[in-house]
Amino acid sequence: CRLVYRTGISVAPFKAQNMSNNAAVTRQGGEIGRAQALQAEACGIESHVDMNPILLKPDSDESAQVVMQGRVRGRSDASALFDRTSEFRRIAYESYSRLANRVDAIILEGAGSAAEVNLRHCDVANWPMVDYADASVLLVADIDRGGVFAQVLGTLDLLTLEERRRIIGVVINKFRGRRELFVEGTTFLEKRSGIPVLGVVPFLSGLRLDQEDSLDHGRQTVFSDSTVNVAVVLLPRMSNFTDFNALAAEPGVALCYADRPEHFAKADVVIIPG
């Protein structure tokens, strides 16, 4: 998003369906995924519910609260969510069309993997949106997790011929170390796949950007006698835990996420999150 914004093109983020308990509130009072709000900031525009028309907020392993175009629309279990695929796609297409009328370019983000073969029938955020928007696709692989060659080549192998034709390039994300150490890897991927590797993005530490799904344990600090020690109870489905980032960054405050009784022994403040 930021890269396109810096070229002077008006751009907006879009993710048709997101699953996260970390939500952001737009100026109009609607809820969207925290990631889309951050991406909107990178685009230099205000966030809007059309950037994330379907937000699923899990309340158990098998059910979720359903937020559609910013408003809560009840809750559904997993099987009922699959039954609503056509409805979700229609809502996503409506939001995308409105958003497309306001900007020159839209960056579509998928969900999960691009090759979830067991979920093709209920896919909302990936290939249905690519087809609707007639979009070109960048396949982004996270090398920091390991297995990047299997990620890229395995994904391409599982795509249909038409899906594969949509892919214009591969981007390797979160690369640590010297770029020249991956030249051989780039060559291998290009020869094996026939698709160019358009970029290798370095791992950037210390960005302090809000996480959407994974709790950022790096924001925790060690309790001491000279700090105000805050323990946040680590609940299984804690929502909006990024709200604690500002507190963790405050001078004189130490914050930890606690899930054992002994973790609370030195705490001056205990917070039970929502």
Regions found by a protein language model. Give the residues of each.
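Flexible phosphate-sensing "switch/lid" loops adjacent to ATP/NTP-binding sites
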Residues: 1-274
